[in-house]
């Protein structure tokens, strides 16, 4: 027989964990190398890199807070979709699908964390949906979560400004599916860096 008690235990803020992790990840051209490696591990045959310097419209978004990610961004697109194990692996810090899929080294897993050297809000599009990570919970996430996902079909109908930012890397306007994966890394601004618990340096795309 056990006596009722109350919950108590240690925890760690996700932002602080990420701050520690990115110290071991490359910056600059090393970030591109990580995505090249991930694309190769996923057996992609194409990788497109696009620098979108535009400030996009932010009037019709699934969450008004997403306006903070509508500025200049680096987009990386390959011609392989996420598998279900990939989607699960990318949600677990410090893991990759290599743990369960043998030779598929780092497939959209560990190497993805290098994104946080660039942005606090990495997002990606695959299998007819857009996913956005939000460790600070100030762009899209709602506690207790640290991110949000939306179906393309619903976005085009009600919040078209959000999927439109992926058009620079090949998403067709109005498309409810995409044959591949597009990552989008909006540059961390000076204002965002000043309040970030992950990295206090703005990211300048050269």
Place the predicted regions along the sequence by residue.
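Glycine/threonine-rich ATP-lid/beta-loop region of ATP-binding domains
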Residues: 171-206
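GHKL (Bergerat-fold) ATPase N-terminal catalytic module, capturing the glycine-rich phosphate-binding loop
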Residues: 1-176
